[in-house]
């Protein structure tokens, strides 16, 4: 994030590189927001984004975009690294534990616990500016990104906080051995078809421990 911000001019060149993509949002946010005052919704979103963003930066990621309650993050910008996939998975684990701790604080304040859904994927993406001269926006697009977003939505039907695409699991296995315990926490769910994709993708899910519910 800091390196990208150092550029005085927009990144005009479009390039393709391999990245890890993370999407996270609050489960049931729309229904929750309907019952809250607008000011309270904004306060909760700020608290959520602050906690989530801290974990992204701690793991070397970049926040690509805030979309309502959702956060879109990328690992591997501006330069690809051997730990990008592991860092994304490690970040997801930190998000789960961070929200669990936050829920403990919320319970003391008489507030309902929050659940999150995270989708992770790994693969090639197109990176560059979109828009026009009057309004350029740096973006990361491609099937890898779209699939990560679909995996995030799949957390609802699998009732899990985390769904991971097999390409990311494979990349973690090929990376540093220190990341191996992260894979041990995942369960292989086999091939699944995602909305908007013709081919199936093998997915892995995370099961919550008692302390995280």
Spans of model-derived segments:
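Alpha-helical scaffold within the catalytic cores of cyclic-nucleotide enzymes
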Residues: 46-61, 77-118, 143-154, 181-185
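Short gly/ser/thr-rich secondary-structure transition/capping motifs
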Residues: 1-6, 100-102
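Catalytic strand-loop-helix junctions within cyclic-nucleotide turnover domains
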Residues: 74-84, 118-138, 155-158
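A structural signal for short, well-ordered beta-strand segments
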Residues: 21, 71, 116-122, 203
């Amino acid at each position: 994030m800091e390196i990208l911000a150092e550029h005085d001019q927009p990144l005009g060149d479009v390039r393709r590189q391999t990245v890890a993509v993370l999407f996270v949002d609050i489960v049931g946010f729309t229904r929750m927001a309907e019952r809250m005052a607008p000011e309270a919704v904004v306060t909760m979103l700020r608290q959520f984004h602050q906690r989530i963003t801290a974990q992204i930066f701690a793991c070397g990621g970049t926040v690509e975009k805030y979309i309502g309650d959702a956060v879109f993050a990328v690992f591997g910008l501006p330069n690809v690294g051997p730990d990008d996939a592991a860092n994304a998975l490690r970040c997801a684990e930190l998000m789960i534990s961070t929200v669990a701790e936050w829920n403990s604080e919320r319970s003391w304040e008489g507030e309902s616990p929050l659940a999150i859904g995270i989708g992770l994927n790994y693969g090639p993406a197109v990176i560059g500016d979109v828009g026009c001269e009057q309004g350029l926006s740096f973006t990361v697009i491609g099937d890898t990104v779209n699939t990560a977003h679909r995996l995030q939505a799949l957390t609802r039907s699998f009732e899990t906080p985390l769904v991971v695409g097999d390409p990311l699991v494979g990349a973690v296995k090929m990376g540093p051995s220190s990341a191996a315990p992260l894979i041990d926490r995942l369960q292989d769910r086999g091939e699944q078809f995602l909305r908007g994709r013709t081919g199936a993708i093998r997915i892995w899910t995370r099961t919550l421990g008692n302390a995280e519910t």
